[in-house]
Regions:
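C-terminal transmembrane helical hairpin of 12-TM major facilitator-type secondary transporters
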Residues: 2-49
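Transmembrane alpha-helical cores of Major Facilitator Superfamily
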Residues: 9, 67-75
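Alpha-helical transmembrane segments of multi-pass secondary-active solute transporters
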Residues: 3, 65, 87, 96-101
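Loop-to-transmembrane helix entry/capping segments in MFS-fold secondary transporters
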Residues: 59-69
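Multi-pass alpha-helical transporter architecture, strongest
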Residues: 19, 99-132
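Discrete transmembrane alpha-helix packing/kink hotspots characteristic
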Residues: 76-80
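Intracellular helix-loop hinge segments at the cytoplasmic ends of transmembrane helices
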Residues: 50-56
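Interfacial helix-cap and linker-helix signal at transmembrane-aqueous boundaries
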Residues: 84-92
């Protein structure tokens, strides 16, 4: 859960940097650096999230749990580009879409905090290595 929270925080910072920092300080080097850091966050979040599923979900329904996760993810892949496209058409700028993307990071951060609390309460061992 800690890696999920760190990745979420980085994601929030990167998208807010695109929304508010780059328009004030336009720099290709800064933009590339932010993209590279955003790539790190996109690695940390799934690296923390996917291994936690079998630690939380009973083995009998693990396949169904992965099915639900992929189902939700695919709905997001369908709807988010449509929403962002409509926002871009309405506003003509990228500030609001970047704020929307950073809000996804906020939701992930809240989920990470909740997951960490549940781990502490129920002892899932989410911070422990998978191989002993």
């Amino acid at each position: 859960a800690s890696m999920l929270m760190i990745g979420s925080f980085i994601m929030i910072a990167c998208h807010l940097s695109f929304a508010f920092l780059l328009p004030v300080f336009p720099s290709k080097v800064l933009a590339v650096a932010i993209i590279a850091i955003l790539g790190v966050s996109f690695s940390l979040v799934p690296a923390a999230l996917w291994p936690s599923v079998p630690k939380i979900i009973d083995e009998r329904i693990l396949g169904s749990a992965y099915c639900v996760i992929f189902w939700i993810q695919n709905w997001g892949l369908l709807l988010v580009p449509v929403v962002i496209g409509k926002v871009l058409d309405a506003t003509g700028g990228y500030t609001l879409p970047m704020v929307i993307f950073s809000s996804f990071g906020v939701f992930a951060l809240i989920f990470g905090l909740w997951l960490k609390r549940e781990d502490k309460k129920k002892g899932y061992g989410l911070e422990l290595p998978n191989i002993k």
